[in-house]
Amino acid sequence: MNVALGGTFDPVHDGHRALFERAFELGDVTVGLTSDELAPKTRHVDRYVRSFAERKRDLETELEPLAAEYDREFAVHELTEPTGIATEPRFDALVVSPETVDTGERINELREDAGVDPLDIVVVDHVIAEDGDVISSTRIVNGEIDEHGNVTPDRDGRDATR
């Protein structure tokens, strides 16, 4: 099975890791990583996002051990628009978080319009931080939690330029 998922992944956290693990359980994985131009447009909160090259490097570091563990292949492709690679016929499934289910449904509409079979949309629940809220990159960048969801009240967040 060929599995797709996409995002900005800045920084990678345990919520992303849950998505990656589920994807590798299903098959070979292709991750669409938002381009430098697209990344800020996908943010619900205006914040600095590291460069594509930095994010790709960190993402590959996360994916390599999972690929080895599940004996799967993976690739990272640049996304220049939100529906990205998932409209390509080679994919069978799309792994999404609860807030990106709508994007998955939109991708299936585009696939249907193009005469391509719909993807199985696999929803992975949020991972909850120790304070009971969802782990998110924005919360990490703001200094509220670390990548594992531990509360970090004494930590400063990332500033607007790093």
Question: What are the roles of these predicted feature ranges?
Answer:
Residues 1-162:
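Nucleotidyltransferase catalytic core that binds NTPs
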